[in-house]
Amino acid sequence: MGNITAKLVKDLRDKTGAGMMDCKKALNETDGNVEKALEWLRKKGIASAEKKSGRVAAEGSIGSYIHTGSRVGVLLELNCETDFVARGDIFQSLLKDVSMQVAACPNVEYVSIDQIPKDIVEKEKQIEMGRDDLSGKPENIKEKIVEGRIAKRLNELVLLSQPYIKDSALTVEDLVKQAAAKIGENIKVRRFTRYTLGEGIEKNEMDFADEVASLKSN
């Protein structure tokens, strides 16, 4: 692998507008070859999407998805910059795909990492710090292990971090960036709600003997 220097990462970022981590990953994937890294970023839809990410996305659409059998339903708000784009096929297709993703991910609760409340993060840290397999380890080693475990756990709660259900080589965030690059506008997943039939309802379940007894008493 080529020597991936901070300057190389910065130069690639300046050329593409992509984030530092995306640039570093692109260079690692292409052995430090800048031209190939550029191509890698474009294929991921990242190169031009990042430059648009700071623009206001106040238009968009609220989509709904009902899974087969009508047992799971999703409402999702996807934002863009113009009403024209919101009505377009690329945007509407993305809205449907991301809504389907939410339906397929029952553990997902937040759009992005920065939406997770600090008390949830702290609670996860306390749980991990108290695990038996960490007892006796030096504090600095314990901190690193816990940091990795927490990052993994928090990513499980975040929609944008999920592997895309139709192509696990992509994350949902990659999918959104690809669409943004194609249409030339900033796109944001703002919020979502997932409904599961019967969720939160306590069912009165009889065993067979109780059911027979209740029939006899009628």
UniProtKB/Swiss-Prot annotation:
GO terms for molecular function: translation elongation factor activity. InterPro entries: EF-Ts_dimer_sf, Transl_elong_EFTs/EF1B, Transl_elong_EFTs/EF1B_dimer, Transl_elong_Ts_CS, UBA-like_sf. It is found in: Cytoplasm. Residues 82-85 are annotated as: Involved in Mg(2+) ion dislocation from EF-Tu. One of its GO terms (cellular component) is cytoplasm. It comes from the Bacteria. SUPFAM superfamilies: Elongation factor Ts (EF-Ts), dimerisation domain (SSF54713), UBA-like (SSF46934). Its main location: cytoplasm. Keywords: Cytoplasm, Elongation factor, Protein biosynthesis. Associates with the EF-Tu.GDP complex and induces the exchange of GDP to GTP. It remains bound to the aminoacyl-tRNA.EF-Tu.GTP complex up to the GTP hydrolysis stage on the ribosome. PANTHER family: ELONGATION FACTOR TS, POLYPROTEIN OF EF-TS, CHLOROPLASTIC. HAMAP family: EF_Ts. Belongs to the EF-Ts family. This is Elongation factor Ts. The lineage of its organism: Bacteria, Bacillati, Cyanobacteriota, Cyanophyceae, Synechococcales.
